[in-house]
């Protein structure tokens, strides 16, 4: 059987793993790549290609990087000249038109970072961690116009451990997504696998994370705050205030042994230890292990305490 000709659409590191898998697989030929335009990055804000573009250029692939593929019909015509039989979309970051979806013999397939229909939308990895899910995974779906609503070609699942953060889950899912492409995509193209419809009664939405969500509300539960800290490390992060200055939170854990809580107001420090501080919440106690003061690097609480004389009764969030 001849190689399956693939048009690949993707942008961040999550997509790089999938592109590498296709490039190394003798059953596929990547005939071209579509990605987001170069963006300013680093302290000097130099225009920098997306991770997918950098990999594509290293392999001398054709690359297009439109601001909006939807608004550029001539670019779609150019893509059609590549002769791709299927489009593989992994974290591309743009809405695709029905005309684009209909432009390939085997249609367009998408690697999505959740077990659909749970967590359709822009932030499935972060929302799974934030919600306290005990399982996640990746789905290979046949793309339709409605967001993340296509028939399912294949799924890979993984357990979420209590201390796993979104960056760690991201890396696991990226690898599982690549495995899905190398196995289920080939079965689908050969006609050996029939996609199955999603159960619309089980849909949950993973809305984009807004900056306003990053501030910790200490009146919520310790479990909810811990989930947000671990979930938002892949994205805007989380923060609170200490003595009027912003304090980013990087690593925490829920505990029952948090000092004398009594009727402590949420956000109150209930215990100060060498390697962590305990903070009262609306339900339970949260131990903080790593933080980042304004204009400083991330640091362990032990180092933070050397320059900040915290005591029981001090208040976070003000």
UniProtKB/Swiss-Prot annotation:
Against Pfam families, the record matches this protein to: Formyl_trans_C, Formyl_trans_N
Residues where (6S)-5,6,7,8-tetrahydrofolate binds = 114-117
UniProt keyword annotation of Signal present: no
Entry's EC annotation: 2.1.2.9
What are the GO MF terms of this UniProt record?
methionyl-tRNA formyltransferase activity
Coiled coil regions, renumbered to chain: none
Provide this UniProt record's keywords sorted from A to Z. Answer: Protein biosynthesis, Transferase
The record's InterPro entries line, in alphabetical order, gives: Fmt (IPR005794), Formyl_trans_C (IPR005793), Formyl_transf_N (IPR002376), Formyl_transf_N_sf (IPR036477), Formyl_transferase-like_C_sf (IPR011034), GART_AS (IPR001555), Met-tRNA-FMT_C (IPR044135), Met-tRNA-FMT_N (IPR041711)
Please write the reaction equations for the catalytic activity of this protein. Answer: L-methionyl-tRNA(fMet) + (6R)-10-formyltetrahydrofolate = N-formyl-L-methionyl-tRNA(fMet) + (6S)-5,6,7,8-tetrahydrofolate + H(+)
Listed under GO cellular component are: cytosol
Q: Sum up the protein's function in the record's words.
A: Attaches a formyl group to the free amino group of methionyl-tRNA(fMet). The formyl group appears to play a dual role in the initiator identity of N-formylmethionyl-tRNA by promoting its recognition by IF2 and preventing the misappropriation of this tRNA by the elongation apparatus.
Family assignment?
A: Belongs to the Fmt family.
Supply the name of the protein: Methionyl-tRNA formyltransferase
The species is Bdellovibrio bacteriovorus (strain ATCC 15356 / DSM 50701 / NCIMB 9529 / HD100)
Q: What is the lineage of its organism?
A: Bacteria, Pseudomonadati, Bdellovibrionota, Bdellovibrionia, Bdellovibrionales
């Amino acid at each position: 059987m001849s190689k399956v000709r693939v048009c690949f659409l993707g942008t961040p590191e999550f997509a790089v793993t999938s592109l590498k898998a296709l490039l190394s697989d003798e059953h596929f030929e990547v005939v071209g790549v579509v990605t987001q335009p170069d963006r300013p990055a680093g302290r000097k804000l130099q225009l920098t290609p997306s991770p997918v573009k950098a990999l594509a250029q290293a392999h001398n692939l054709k690359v297009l990087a439109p601001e909006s593929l939807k608004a550029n019909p001539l670019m779609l015509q150019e893509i059609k000249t590549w002769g791709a039989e299927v489009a593989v979309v992994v974290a591309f970051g743009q809405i695709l038109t029905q005309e684009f979806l209909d432009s390939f013999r085997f249609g367009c397939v998408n690697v999505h970072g959740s077990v659909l229909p749970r967590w359709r939308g822009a932030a499935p990895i972060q929302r799974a961690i934030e919600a306290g899910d005990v399982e996640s995974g990746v789905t290979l779906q046949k793309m339709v116009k409605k967001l993340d609503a296509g028939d399912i070609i294949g799924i890979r699942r993984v357990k979420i451990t209590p201390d796993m953060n979104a960056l760690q889950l991201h890396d696991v899912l990226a690898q599982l997504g690549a495995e899905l492409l190398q196995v289920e995509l080939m079965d689908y193209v050969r006609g050996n696998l029939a996609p199955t419809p999603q159960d619309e009664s089980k849909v949950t939405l993973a809305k984009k994370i807004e900056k306003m969500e990053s501030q910790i509300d200490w009146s919520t539960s310790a479990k909810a705050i811990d989930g947000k800290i671990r979930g938002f490390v892949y994205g805007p992060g989380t923060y609170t205030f200490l003595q009027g200055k912003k304090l980013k939170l990087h690593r925490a854990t829920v505990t029952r042994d948090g000092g004398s809580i009594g009727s402590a107001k949420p956000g109150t420090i209930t215990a100060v230890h060498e390697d962590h501080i305990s903070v009262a919440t609306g339900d339970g106690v949260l131990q903080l292990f790593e933080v980042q003061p304004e204009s400083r690097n991330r640091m362990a609480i032990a180092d933070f305490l050397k320059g900040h004389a915290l005591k029981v009764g001090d208040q976070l969030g003000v």
